[in-house]
Amino acid sequence: AKGRRPNRLLTDALREIRNTRSRFFSLMILSALAVCFLAGLRATAPDMKISADRYLDGQKLMDLRVVSTLGLTEEDVAALADQPGVALVQGAYSVDAIAKIQDKDSVVKVISLTDEVNLPRMVEGRMPGNAQECLVEPRYLQENGLSIGDKITLDTGTGTYEDALRHETYTIVGTADSPLYIGVERGSSTLGTGKVAFYVMLPEEAFDMEAYTDAYLLADGALELPTYSQEYEDLIDSLADALDPMAQERAQLRGDSVREEAQE
């Protein structure tokens, strides 16, 4: 009797399948779909990383960003460029502003266009030709009912960056994607709602600031490494650690300089 039990179990199983045939095949199809979906994800993830790496390398996305509450001078940028492991450094400006369009206000991050790092990818229109022209991200036009050729007004508030921009009104001459923003989040702000909704790109000459707010670095050897690899992370972490003592020294010098200017 014990030797015949497996056959009986098999017979019962087959009978159950015949009696519930539609449910059985439904489960089989669902299982097959789940396996195919998982296999697709496993195959797609590496391809997505490769595509992202090519895009970021093509737009020369910075490897490190250096910021200072007191700003960064040309001397600071030059000092960073002289450090071992640094391939290139470019200073840049960024400031939060309220973009005013008719009766609608939005908090935007205003960033300076750079020609060696963080290159924008044009979607429509052209690059700005003077200090009163700007690029915006594509969805800025879509969500505000605007078109290329329309004007926006930028208000930086009454704080530290009250006079950071040379003009108030700018003509939109194109839309572009910035490699600095590859997700949906745009960051936080002390202006308006406290949440940045869009980014706007201006030529460097549109800013009226004594010092850079940011310095963007490209690391030696980083271009040859996959962006999402452990080797890349280790390289950038090592460079950041190596730059820290020099950054502390430059911050002290900058602080002393600002205090001396305030006393004069």
What do these predicted regions represent?
Residues K2-E264:
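Membrane transport/envelope proteins' first extracytoplasmic loop
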